[in-house]
């Protein structure tokens, strides 16, 4: 990444699947923080209602691996077998060139990798579910998950929860309005808005 880019910052939201990070990120995007969503590239199937180039850049496994070999990612992870997710360098540069700060909605390891790559320019926030039971309920309510994917995600969640201590801030999402307020407070302080 070139050093002459706008001195934008990065706000990273990570959590186990179903903890509410996407809902919080969408809320923050509606506020006056000059944030722009970093669209990740992924190899997973597109879900109903999702839009290529808005929710994700949906690419083939072959294309993803080629981009890895060409060092086109800031970070990438094989989140589940043959389901790769990553942040393209061009995506961060695009947002900074527009004069905005980047906001990420990424898995736990991806969030930690971004924090490591960008250091003090990045704020890493972990969204904590109230319990594993509530996490399972949220995944089941999505109606986009198979029993197998719920089992896989729930198997990964305890390990992800242990990594919460590695983040700059933790938001407990037991009440959505409180989580929104805490997210606004944390992000505002980091960006110098409050």
Model-based region annotation:
Residues 2-4, 137, 141-145, 159-194:
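NTP-dependent small-molecule kinase module
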Residues 44-49, 72, 96-101, 105-108, ...:
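A glycine- and Lys/Arg-enriched "phosphate-lid" helix/loop adjacent to the NTP-binding pocket
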Residues 24-25:
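Post-Walker A alpha-helix
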Residues 30-38:
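Post-Walker A helix-loop "phosphate-sensing" segment adjacent to the P-loop in P-loop NTPases
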Residues 21:
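Conserved lysine of the Walker
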Residues 14-16:
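P-loop (Walker A) phosphate-binding loop of NTP-binding proteins
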Residues 42-102, 109-112:
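ATP-dependent small-molecule kinase phosphotransfer cores
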Residues 6-11:
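Pre-Walker A (Motif I) flank of P-loop NTPase domains
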